[in-house]
Amino acid sequence: MADRCLLYYITDRSQFPGDERTRRRVLLATVAEAARARVDYIQLREKDLSARELEMLARDALTAVRNSTPLRTENRELRTRLLINSRTDVALAAGADGVHLRAEDVAPHDVRHVLEVSTHRPLTTDHFLVAASCHTVADVFRAESEKADFAVFAPVFGKRGGAGTPPAGLAALQEACRAKIRVLALGGVTIDNAASCLEAGAAGVAGIRLFQENKIEDVVRALRAL
């Protein structure tokens, strides 16, 4: 079991009520709440936005994170870190802490190579995180070989309503966690079943509704007590 449960909030403003302006305001407030509660990572996953719109939202989200971090520090390892879904270009333009790559995106080691060439220095987790979405055990080991910093394995328990990819289950999660990179569990994870993910070897848990439909401070307190 992980020494400290890593927590990964994935955003989805479409779940919030109201018009677009209201949803963005609520999203940024939720991002700030997550930073205050010391969630480790936030993934800005607003896939419908254009690159320019996403960059603007990412800058606002970064401001919300930095203004809400209890330690008031610029040390990225000591505050909530913001990753952008899929768009490495937007992550770099906005000054985000990393990118979360989908299975169909450029491989993690290629992202690292481009960044190392452009910055003339080795890419470390202090500078930029590269996370990878994984849906099979093989995906996780591929992410490890391609130098991802961590993998998000999903869906473990399935999505609400039962639609989409069938749940992989805890046995598959346990097998995936044999990889040397950190693996976070996603998909139907709740406060009640998160402990079973950690017992399977996960370094932490990720979710959308887990954070957006609950008071984040309470979620963090419960999960960090596991």
Task: Please annotate each region the language model reported.
Residues 149-156:
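Non-cysteine beta-strand/loop elements that form the S-adenosyl-L-methionine
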